[in-house]
Regions:
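Short, glycine-/small- and polar/acidic-enriched structural segments
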Residues: 4-8, 12-164, 354-355
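Short glycine-centered helix-capping/turn motifs at secondary-structure transition points
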Residues: 31-32, 36-37, 187, 206, ...
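Short, solvent-exposed loop/beta-turn-alpha elements that line the ligand-binding surface or hinge
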Residues: 40, 44, 217-223, 294-303
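Short, surface-exposed acidic
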Residues: 45-53, 154-161, 245, 276-289, ...
Length: 356
């Protein structure tokens, strides 16, 4: 390698640090940044290599994303899985919480006699169950069904659930929604749930009857529908955070800017969301309504943490996590207030490769 006189070789001689990032294929701050290359640009001239879990099909990487055992991982995904994985190995730390409000459809076959939510009494409802120790899809659907039934005074004892067997949640491009549709069309289940833009697309393609559509605005404005909110957490590998707090703070600062960017460039944001979910722009627009920038926001306000506590209590009641699990030791939301100061490059990254 030829180096000109006076050139700073400190970064050139440093080995690159691999940092994994992961997000759900819906509206997330990380998705908005990833599609614009903003995360990579933040560290363009530094020995940090950001790699998406989504583009990697190695089983150990996919499993490590799910249980947060993957070193150097920063993850924005469903909160239930994050809580479960923290209870499993205490490997992660919570940086921020996000809320996604999107359309939730109650659907039945076109020939079904179900015309309204009250008609669900005595019916069989589709409920997914992924393989493995923890099923995020089951948590989401069960909370949603309980919430929906409660709006019309029904309980779980008034209906029956039909289990939809699905792949392990770490499987790339798993397709639970299509399996639910198959169960509804075949008569194994009388009704099912479809979520977000992909749900709108699939319901239309399958010719399903929409019994009820809960819009994002209605969900956000009605506390009784809080079980329909997609609660997300931004978490980070704890050893990586301890060794590289300034790096994590910079990543977090980028992620918390996504909502402002979405507000300034709504058309571009909508296009990115459609790309993330592999859906049409019109379906993404209908699914999220006017709440895209609100849904992209991340923070640690009291109301966000209260909603996270409600979810944790729900999981404890169903023995999905240990009763001793506590949010307080998990939190590192103080990183939201850290602003990395410019320092000598050697000092700044001398601990960068501490984490294996």
């Amino acid at each position: 390698m030829t180096v000109r006189p006076g050139t700073d070789t400190s970064t050139a001689t440093m080995p690159s640090q691999l940092v994994w990032y992961a997000r759900c294929p819906t509206l997330t701050a990380m998705g908005l940044l990833a599609n614009r290359g903003a995360l990579q640009r933040e560290f363009l001239r530094e020995p940090i290599n950001l790699v998406s879990v989504r583009e990697n099909s190695t089983p150990s990487v996919r499993q490590g994303y799910l249980d947060h055992s993957l070193p150097n991982l920063i993850r924005e995904g469903d909160a239930a899985t994050a809580l479960w994985s923290y209870g499993l190995n205490q490997r992660s730390r919570l940086l921020a919480v996000g809320h996604t409000w999107h359309t939730v459809l109650v659907v039945a076959s076109g020939r079904s006699g179900i015309g309204r939510l009250n008609d669900l009494k005595g019916r069989t409802l589709a409920l997914p169950r992924e393989a493995g120790a923890f099923s995020p899809a089951r948590v989401r659907s069960l909370r949603a069904w309980e919430t929906i039934l409660d709006t019309v005074g029904l309980r779980a004892s008034d209906i029956e659930f039909h289990n939809i067997v699905a792949d392990h949640p770490s499987t790339p491009f798993g397709d639970i929604a299509r399996r639910e549709i198959e169960a509804v069309l075949s008569g194994q289940a009388d009704a099912g749930l479809l979520f977000g833009a992909k749900g709108l697309e699939l319901a239309r393609a399958a010719g399903l009857k929409v019994i009820h559509s809960f819009t994002p605005e209605v969900i956000r404005n009605d506390p009784a529908l809080s079980g329909l909110v997609e609660l997300r957490t931004l978490t980070v590998d704890y050893p990586f955070l301890e060794a590289n707090e300034a790096v994590v703070a910079r990543l977090l600062r980028q992620l918390t800017s996504a909502a402002d960017w979405a507000a300034q460039f709504p058309k571009e944001a909508l296009n990115h969301i459609a790309l993330e979910g592999k859906v049409e722009v019109a379906d993404a627009a209908q699914a999220y309504g006017p709440l895209i920038n609100a849904g992209a926001a991340l923070g640690a306000e009291d109301w966000r943490l209260r909603d996270l506590q409600v979810l944790l209590d729900w999981l404890k009641l169903r023995h999905a996590v240990d009763d001793s699990l506590n949010l307080t030791p998990w939190q590192r939301t103080d990183v939201l207030n850290i602003f990395a100061q410019p320092t000598d490059i050697k000092e700044k990254y001398k601990r960068l490769n501490v984490v294996a």
